[in-house]
Amino acid sequence: MNLTEICDNAKKGREYALLGNYDSSMVYYQGVIQQIHKHCQSLRDPAQKVKWQQVRQELAEEYEQVKSIVSTLESFKVDKAVDFPNPVPEEGPRDPDVWPPPTPAEHRGPVQVKKPVPLSKPQRKESPGMQHRGAVGRGQANIKPDRPNTRDGRGNKAKEEKSKRNAQEGAADVEQKKFDGTGYDSDLVDALERDIVSRNPNIHWDDIADLEDAKKLLREAVVLPMWMPDFFKGIRRPWKGVLMVGPPGTGKTMLAKAVATECGTTFFNVSSSTLTSKYRGESEKLVRLLFEMARFYAPTTIFIDEIDSICGRRGTSDEHEASRRVKSELLVQMDGVGGAQESEDPSKMVMVLAATNFPWDIDEALRRRLEKRIYIPLPTAKGRAELLKINLREVDVASDVDLTVFAEKIEGYSGADITNVCRDASMMAMRRRIQGLSPEEIRALSKDELQMPVTMEDFELALKKISKSVSAADLEKYESWMSEFGSV
């Protein structure tokens, strides 16, 4: 991707907007936005990617401003066409007793002359190149004939034609990426489009300690099919579904956020509230619409957190007819995903990523469709030490703190429990400093007085206050289920 070409197109779009040539300006803006989008997909550095996304957002705002100007000018044009003929016939018969002036004849003459003038002016202005500014100031009907004259005046015709071609291709791509919700309620389409994670969750693989097997599997299921589409065909098609199983607080949702940040696919964040409605039959439509939108925006990852609340075991006594229909539609749509097997392009895939704390409550048919079922366990000793370093990287730690030794003491704690311990320990110094002070004295404290390093004693006190949230019996249930139904 030529960065100079991106800068030139952005500059030309702004120049055309300043000159009033809004039609050409919109073409350049659409092209440069699409070029930056393609450039972001090729970047691997997250910091550079975020900067380019900010630039793209600024250009998109400028493009919207130009569009609003064009729509305003078009409304003026329509108003003039409507307002001109109306007062003309009303002026004549207003005073029948007075000798009629010759104004009606004079009004009719110019109206008839003005009608063919806009049609003939562009034909006369195709040849001269010095009159294009006047045409731009008078209306947009004269913009298109001015493009070749502007290019010839600048003397870089080949470069301009290439930029125009790229801009038009970018505009076509932007138009293609708008989902057509014909046949569905517009409110349902808007509700699902809001669940597309467009902003960056800012969670990277390095922010998650341990869990190397889970990271490797998610890269294989989401990233590699886009990098090697020729390899992932036939029996080696990408995985259609991945289920993350484990006790609460072990990082299942964090892994999903990392997938949304790192993998560059369209990411749908779906919960039970997204797919439920009080109207009969609307929940099934939402499920079908979700997968149709996912196939349209492919490659796509659909993350369903706490999937046991949506697709529990069928045939139980507390099951309702409406929930059974939703489960059936979800199972049908998941079985029909099969993007890499049926599509010509294996990278146009739809992968369902699910997480649950109760895998034994999931329906058997859904368990079959989630081809990979991985266990997200409690962190190991190495993982606990890494978690302590990640949580304390913005806090000053005293020299007497040995994180490796403390990691051995918190065996059996989940990732969320370790985060709570670190948060409580980092606040111990502040609690000691404000003890016995009045509110006025607390407000008068400086920031440096509160920034005290965390000591080993603070960690010991926090550990006494916070107990682990996962019992040994729960771990045995997860391990028993994984030994019977696991698929790593």
From Swiss-Prot:
Pfam families: AAA, AAA_lid_3, KATNA1_MIT, Vps4_C. It catalyses: n ATP + n H2O + a microtubule = n ADP + n phosphate + (n+1) alpha/beta tubulin heterodimers. It comes from the Eukaryota. Signal peptide: none annotated. GO terms for molecular function: ATP binding; ATP hydrolysis activity; microtubule binding; microtubule severing ATPase activity. Its EC number is 5.6.1.1. It is found in: Cytoplasm, Cytoskeleton; Cytoplasm; Cytoplasm, Cytoskeleton, Spindle pole; Cytoplasm, Cytoskeleton, Spindle. PROSITE patterns: AAA (PS00674). SMART domains: AAA (SM00382). One of its GO terms (biological process) is anatomical structure morphogenesis. SUPFAM superfamilies: P-loop containing nucleoside triphosphate hydrolases. Transmembrane segments: none annotated. The keyword Transmembrane does not apply. Its main location: cytoplasm. Residues 144-167 have a biased composition (Basic and acidic residues). GO terms for cellular component: centrosome; cytoplasm; microtubule; microtubule cytoskeleton; spindle; spindle pole. Keywords: ATP-binding, Cytoplasm, Cytoskeleton, Isomerase, Microtubule, Nucleotide-binding. ATP binds at G246, P247, P248, G249, T250, G251, K252, T253. Belongs to the AAA ATPase family. Katanin p60 subunit A1 subfamily. A-like 1 sub-subfamily. PANTHER family: AAA DOMAIN-CONTAINING (PTHR23074), KATANIN P60 ATPASE-CONTAINING SUBUNIT A-LIKE 1 (PTHR23074:SF65). Regulates microtubule dynamics in Sertoli cells, a process that is essential for spermiogenesis and male fertility. Severs microtubules in an ATP-dependent manner, promoting rapid reorganization of cellular microtubule arrays. This is Katanin p60 ATPase-containing subunit A-like 1. It comes from Danio rerio (Zebrafish). The gene is katnal1.
